[in-house]
Amino acid sequence: MIFMKDNIVTVEHLSFTYKDSEEPAVKDVSFSIPKGTWTTLVGHNGSGKSTIARLLNGILLPDDNPETLINIDGITLTEKTMWDIRDRVGIVFQNPDNQFVGATVEDDVAFGLENRQVPRPKMKSIVQDVLNQVGMTNFQKSEPQYLSGGQKQRVAIAGILAIGPKLIILDESTSMLDPAGKFKILKLIRKLQKENELTIFSITHDINEAEHADQILVLDKGSLLASDSPVDIFKDVSLIKNAGLDLPLFYKIKNKLINKGISIPQEVNTEEKLVKYLCQLNSKM
Ligand SMILES: Nc1ncnc2c1ncn2[C@@H]1O[C@H](COP(=O)(O)OP(=O)(O)OP(=O)(O)O)[C@@H](O)[C@H]1O
C-alpha cells in the first residue's frame, strides 16, 4: 500500500456493523484527508457519521476485511497501535459536560497531561498556552459546569489541544450552540487550524457548517456519495437532495440568480459579499 505523503488520513474499504444489527452502519467507505486542511463529513441523522468518528480513533474496530485500511499520520490502526493513534487524534463531542473530569477549568485541561506524566512546570505552561489560544485565560479557576455552552466547548477544545494532536475530530460539537456561538467556535477552529497546522475532521448534519471546510464528504445510509470542495459539492443539487440534505442559503440564492440569467463572479462567495454585489448591481440599473 502506498500512502500519499500529504494525506494525514487514509481510509479504504471501511465497513462497520453493530452487534445484533443486520445492516452495516458504515458501508465500504474510502476517503483521504490532506494534512493541515479541514474536512467536514455531512449526512442526515443516522447516516453513520459518529460511527466513522469512533472508527477513526479505535473506539470501534472495523468489520473484518483484508482490504480495510485506516492509516493516520503514517500509522495503520490495529488493536496494537490504538493508543499511538489516540495520542494523535483528539475528539470533541457534542455535549462537553460528558467530557469534563476536572473541578476547575485548569484542572480539566491538565487532565490528559497528568495522565501522560508531563512534569508540573511544563504542564502549567501548556495549560496557560492552550487556554490563551481558546480565549479562556480568565476562566481558569471556574468550575466547568457553570460556563456557557460556547465556553464549555472552548475548554473541551483546549483539553484536546493540550495533548498536541495531529488530527482533531469535532463530532457535532457546535450543534448545542446558538447561531452566533456556533459561528464563533467555527472561527476559532479555523484560527487554531491555521496557527497549529492542525488537520480538522468535523462531523455535522448542518449543511451551513460544511461551507467552512476545504473538503466535504457526503454520507447517506452509511455510504459515501461524494467527496469534493464545497463549491463543487453544492453545484450538484440532486446529490444534496439524495442525501436528504438542503443547500446552504448562499447557494440557494446564488442558483436562483443564475437561473434568472444573473451571473455571479467567483469571488462573490459569501452571503455578505452577495448582498453587497446585488446592491452594487441594483445601483447601476
Ligand atoms: N450502539 C449502537 N448499537 C446499534 N446500532 C447503533 C448504535 N449506535 C448507532 N447505531 C445505528 O447505526 C446507524 C448510524 O448511527 P450514527 O450514530 O453513526 O449516525 P449519525 O449520522 O452520527 O447520526 P446522528 O446525526 O443522529 O448523530 C444508525 O442506524 C444507528 O441507529
UniProtKB/Swiss-Prot annotation:
* Listed name of the protein: Energy-coupling factor transporter ATP-binding protein EcfA1
Main localization (coarse): membrane
Known EC number(s)?
7.-.-.-
The subunit field of the Swiss-Prot or TrEMBL record says: Forms a stable energy-coupling factor (ECF) transporter complex composed of 2 membrane-embedded substrate-binding proteins (S component), 2 ATP-binding proteins (A component) and 2 transmembrane proteins (T component).
Q: Which UniProt keywords are present, listed alphabetically?
A: ATP-binding, Cell membrane, Membrane, Nucleotide-binding, Translocase, Transport
Residue sites binding ATP per the record: G43, H44, N45, G46, S47, G48, K49, S50
User: Does Glycoprotein show up as a keyword for this record?
Assistant: no
Which gene name belongs to this protein? ecfA1
| One annotated Gene Ontology cellular component of this protein | ATP-binding cassette (ABC) transporter complex
Q: Pfam families per the record?
A: ABC_tran
Localized where? Answer: Cell membrane
Question: Which residue intervals define the domain ABC transporter in the entry?
Answer: 9-246
Lipid bilayer topology = Peripheral membrane protein
| Summary of the function given for this chain in its UniProt record | ATP-binding (A) component of a common energy-coupling factor (ECF) ABC-transporter complex. Unlike classic ABC transporters this ECF transporter provides the energy necessary to transport a number of different substrates.
Q: Which CDD domains match?
A: ABC_cobalt_CbiO_domain1
The UniProt entry, under InterPro entries, shows: AAA+_ATPase, ABC_transporter-like_ATP-bd, ABC_transporter-like_CS, ABC_transpr_CbiO/EcfA_su, ECF_ABC_transporter_ATP-bd, EcfA_1, P-loop_NTPase
Q: Name one GO molecular function term.
A: ATP binding
Per its UniProt entry, which superkingdom is the organism in? Bacteria
| Similarity comment: family membership | Belongs to the ABC transporter superfamily. Energy-coupling factor EcfA family.
